Curated annotation (Swiss-Prot):
This is Cecropin-B. Its main location: secreted. Keywords: Amidation, Antibiotic, Antimicrobial, Hydroxylation, Immunity, Innate immunity, Secreted, Signal. It holds the Pfam family Cecropin. Residues 1-22 form the signal peptide.
Length: 63
């Protein structure tokens, strides 16, 4: 009888620890979408930098 109580207590302890240690997956991914948009904008600005410099120098030569 005592062994059954100890076994059930250990089982309940393991069950409780396994439920609390698992990290839930975030349900709202809106911040990841905002971060991706910001990354795309930043990359677009970095890629457009040399083209803007060429246009500026061509405009200066044309004057």
């Amino acid at each position: 009888m005592n062994f059954a109580k100890i076994l059930s207590f250990v089982f309940a302890l393991v069950l409780a620890l396994s439920m609390t240690s698992a990290a839930p997956e975030p349900r709202w991914k809106i911040f990841k979408k905002i971060e991706k948009m910001g990354r795309n904008i930043r990359d677009g600005i970095v890629k457009a930098g040399p083209a803007i410099e060429v246009l500026g120098s061509a405009k200066a030569i044309g004057k």
